[in-house]
Curated annotation (Swiss-Prot):
EC number: 4.6.1.12
Name assigned to this protein: 2-C-methyl-D-erythritol 2,4-cyclodiphosphate synthase
Keyword Lyase assigned: yes
Keywords attached to this entry: Isoprene biosynthesis, Lyase, Metal-binding
Length: 174
């Protein structure tokens, strides 16, 4: 194999929304999404958190897999484990991202650029896109763009059952 240069990786993550009344907080792209004060009780369920061993931040988790894939260092499960007793249990996605960046550096890689597409009907990512990009970029140490889309009411994200994200990342050998 010749010189490595820039490597690309792709990641995906999906989680089901937690049942209403579960007490789970909604974290996406490193941001907490509180229930708006003006929200009706019926609409408040739309801000229920995401099921998962950690905070369920699909954007952060997809980005983690993309970074690790680019450097050929495994995936989120191989680094943080799976289940309630895993190393990553209860962790916030931003903290996991920072740990991944340190892991990349210790293996001779640095993030160069990344993109995350969040797929779901809620919450409305566009209202906080700049914040999401800033939070993820700060955690990773490179520019991270964030886009959002729906599936026109198709599939589990379209039916409001959950949310997903796809990420691509470039890393450089240092």
């Amino acid at each position: 194999m010749g010189s490595v240069g820039v490597l690309i990786g792709q990641g995906f993550d999906a989680h089901r929304f937690a049942p209403a009344g579960s007490g789970r907080e909604l974290w996406i792209a490193g941001l907490y999404w509180p229930v708006p004060d003006s929200c009706s009780e019926a609409d408040a369920a739309k801000y229920e958190g995401i099921e998962g061993d950690s905070d369920g931040d699909v954007a952060a988790h997809a980005l983690i897999d993309a970074l690790l894939a680019a450097a050929r260092l495994g995936d989120i499960g191989s680094l943080f484990g799976v289940g309630a007793d895993a190393h990553g249990a209860g962790m916030h996605g931003i903290d996991m991202l920072q740990e991944v960046v340190a892991h990349l550096a210790s293996n001779g890689y640095t993030p160069a650029s990344a993109s995350v597409a969040i797929i779901g009907n809620r919450p409305k990512i566009g209202t906080r896109r700049a914040e999401a990009e800033a939070a993820l970029s700060a955690a990773v140490g490179c520019p991270v763009s964030v886009t959002a889309t729906t599936t026109d009411h198709m599939g589990f994200t379209g039916h409001g059952e959950g949310i997903a994200a796809i990420a691509n990342a470039l890393v450089e050998k240092i």
